[in-house]
């Protein structure tokens, strides 16, 4: 797991990994693929302040979430790719 602790209302998400794709005998490179918009919450911030009170985040570590296509900041840590996004950029929690 990454040793990154998001601040405030931010969430650290590990995007779902796509399998390598081939169309016929042609390999489709990562740069030509759509980025996944689903991932697993790895770490969460402490929450956000509203009217002087700390409001905890609704998502929890381990939740699978859907987020906007252009949401967040991509980072790499310990050889893995992560996104740091605001909780407000999370569109839904996937119930399995």
UniProtKB/Swiss-Prot annotation:
**What are the GO cellular component annotations?**
cytoplasm
Which Gene3D superfamilies does the record match to this protein?
GroES chaperonin (2.30.33.40)
Query: What are the record keywords, sorted?
Result: Chaperone, Cytoplasm
Main subcellular location: cytoplasm
Q: Mention one GO biological process in which this protein takes part, according to its record.
A: chaperone cofactor-dependent protein refolding
Localisation per UniProt entry: Cytoplasm
What Pfam families does this protein map onto?
Cpn10
The family database entries (SMART domains) matched by this protein are listed as: Cpn10
Q: Which PROSITE patterns match?
A: CHAPERONINS_CPN10
User: Which InterPro entries does UniProt cross-reference here?
Assistant: Chaperonin_GroES (IPR020818), Chaperonin_GroES_sf (IPR037124), Chaprnonin_Cpn10_CS (IPR018369), GroES-like_sf (IPR011032)
GO molecular function list: ATP binding; metal ion binding; protein folding chaperone; protein-folding chaperone binding; unfolded protein binding
Q: Has keyword Chaperone?
A: yes
Key word Oxidoreductase present = no
What is its quaternary makeup?
Heptamer of 7 subunits arranged in a ring. Interacts with the chaperonin GroEL.
Similarity comment: Belongs to the GroES chaperonin family.
Function of the molecule:
Together with the chaperonin GroEL, plays an essential role in assisting protein folding. The GroEL-GroES system forms a nano-cage that allows encapsulation of the non-native substrate proteins and provides a physical environment optimized to promote and accelerate protein folding. GroES binds to the apical surface of the GroEL ring, thereby capping the opening of the GroEL channel.
Q: What is the protein's name according to its record?
A: Co-chaperonin GroES
* Species of origin: Leptospira borgpetersenii serovar Hardjo-bovis (strain JB197)
